[in-house]
A protein has these predicted regions:
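Bacterial N-terminal signal peptides that target proteins for export
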Residues: 1-9
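Extracellular carbohydrate-recognition regions
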Residues: 21-41, 216-221
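Short carbohydrate-recognition loop motifs
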Residues: 47-67
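Extracellular/lumenal carbohydrate-interaction signature centered on repeated Trp-anchored short motifs
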Residues: 71-82, 156-159, 180
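Solvent-exposed strand-to-loop "edge" motifs in beta-rich extracellular domains
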Residues: 85-91, 114-116, 170
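Extracellular/luminal beta-rich ligand-recognition
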Residues: 102-148
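Extracellular beta-strand ligand-recognition surfaces/modules
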Residues: 104-109, 145-155, 159-197
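Extracellular beta-strand elements of beta-rich domains used
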Residues: 187, 207-209
Length: 221
């Protein structure tokens, strides 16, 4: 019997090739909009919009879930930090995010790596804007132990505000999976509300990998 697959595993399995990134990979909103899309339950509506002179990606989930993803090998030895800016319209109060019924997030960014040739041999870290779990909390995905979630933001205190993030992917894999890794094989983002039939809008811009832990410059809220 094939073990349950994480959503990131499904994304990587839909592509037949891997591109290796050179330099410091940086993805503008225009570039993210060209990434492949994968539906899990209906379609999250992705659009390019302008906010305060910045072009950003808007993701509207109305009780559905689809992701934009890129399969690309990224060298974490040279660029271990992932950076991005995000904003959400609301959170989902009352969800137990450690359960299958509560596995919904107004915004999430994934990184993943292949650990073998078999389809389920993929490990992913999900950076999420949590509704109930506190900032800094981490937990195993309810659908598979090959996906770990890490709450970078939580609750409504910063709803409607742009927030800059920078996280050491190598350190997070060491903490969550107990192993040192030197590369990942894919990155993705999503706003989803399919399990609990909830709605939210998220905005993303400036996804990049860097040797520096410095925060990106976000649009003004």
């Amino acid at each position: 019997m094939i073990p349950s697959l994480s959503r990131m595993a499904v994304l990587l399995l839909t592509s037949g090739f891997t591109v290796t990134a050179s330099g410091n990979p940086h993805f503008s909103a225009d570039e993210i909009m060209t990434w492949s899309s994968r539906s899990f339950s209906g379609e999250t509506d992705y659009q390019l919009i302008e906010q305060n002179g910045y072009k950003v990606l808007q993701a509207q989930s109305r009780g559905n879930a689809s992701a934009l993803y890129l399969e690309q090998e990224i060298n974490l030895t040279n660029t271990p930090y992932i950076q991005w800016c995000w904003k959400v319209s609301n959170v989902y109060p009352g969800l137990d995010e450690t359960t299958k019924q509560g596995d919904d997030y107004p915004a999430r960014v994934y990184v993943a790596r292949k650990t073998g040739l078999l389809p389920w041999q993929i490990e992913s870290v999900n950076y999420v804007w949590a509704s109930s779990q506190p900032i800094g909390a981490d937990w195993i995905n309810a659908f598979t132990d090959r996906a770990h979630l890490l709450a970078l933001q939580s609750g409504g205190s910063k709803v409607g505000e742009w927030v800059a993030e920078a996280h050491d992917v190598s350190a997070d894999y060491a903490k969550l999976f107990g192993k040192k890794v030197d590369h990942i094989d894919g990155v993705a983002l999503m706003s989803d509300g399919d399990n609990a039939s909830v709605n939210a809008t998220a905005w993303f811009t400036h996804i990049a990998f860097s040797s520096s832990a410095s925060l990106p410059e976000c649009p003004s809220s």
